């Protein structure tokens, strides 16, 4: 719950959940799963931008923008704050947006060096090296209905002088991503490198490379 002291109609309510389960497959081979969801309501709301990963590092040779400016936001909602809904690999930030989101992340984690050694190693680097395969699925939306008219990410707006044309893009609220990557602890930082493909409306999108620093999940 949040409220500005100087504003009467600034109440914001946020409810969310983050549930994780780690299943041992064989020795150090792990199947990790996460379900996260959140909703905000009240006169003022929190907008969630879905897409990308936490602490995504912008690379000088990358030509993919981190935030998709072409996906519109509902101008009729009073958004007081913003947050990222991650992980949704295969996309830039803002592939979907709204005051609600839900997503599932599923990963197979293989600490390859430690697995074949059969015991923990003295080297933090060798001990932490992992290969991963992952699949993400999720959606972000406004209102009660993910397919409702409150979702402006479903609109495409064309402007030609004084003429403005809005077309229903027929986008499905659900997006998915899959791929693989590597993890390692280097100089005290846990580094993640992922290569992912997004699936939007049944189409597989061009791959996106992510370099990030995060221990979460």
Language model segments and positions:
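C-terminal outer-membrane beta-barrel translocator/porin domains of Gram-negative envelope proteins
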Residues: 1-128, 133, 141-144, 155-164
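One face of beta-strands
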Residues: 17, 129, 176-180, 191
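Membrane-spanning beta-strand positions in outer-membrane beta-barrel proteins
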Residues: 30, 190-192
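Short basic (Lys/Arg) and small-residue
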Residues: 136
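Short small-residue beta-strand/loop micro-motif enriched in glycine and branched aliphatics
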Residues: 143, 192-194
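A short alpha/beta connector and helix-capping loop motif
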Residues: 144-180
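Outer-membrane beta-barrel "beta-signal"
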Residues: 184-186, 206-217
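A short, acidic, flexible beta-alpha connecting loop/helix-capping segment that sits on the rim
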Residues: 196-201
């Amino acid at each position: 719950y949040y409220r500005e002291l100087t504003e009467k109609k600034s109440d914001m309510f946020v409810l969310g959940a983050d549930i994780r389960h780690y299943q041992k497959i064989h020795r150090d081979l792990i199947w990790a799963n996460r379900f996260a969801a959140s909703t905000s309501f009240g006169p003022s709301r929190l907008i969630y931008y879905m897409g990308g990963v936490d602490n995504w590092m912008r690379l000088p040779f990358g030509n993919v923008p981190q935030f998709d400016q072409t996906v519109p936001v509902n101008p009729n909602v009073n958004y007081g704050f913003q947050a990222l809904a991650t992980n949704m690999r295969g996309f830039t930030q803002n592939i979907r947006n709204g005051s609600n989101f839900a997503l599932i992340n599923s990963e197979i984690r293989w600490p390859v060096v430690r697995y074949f050694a059969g015991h923990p190693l003295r080297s933090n680097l060798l001990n932490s090296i992992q290969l991963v395969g992952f699949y993400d699925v999720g959606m972000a939306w406004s209102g009660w209905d993910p397919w409702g008219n409150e979702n402006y990410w479903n609109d495409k707006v064309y402007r030609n002088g004084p003429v403005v044309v809005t077309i229903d893009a027929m986008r499905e609220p659900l997006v998915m991503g899959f791929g693989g990557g590597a993890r390692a602890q280097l100089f005290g930082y846990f580094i993640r490198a992922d290569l992912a493909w997004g699936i939007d409306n049944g189409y597989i999108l061009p791959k996106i490379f992510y370099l990030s620093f995060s221990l979460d999940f």
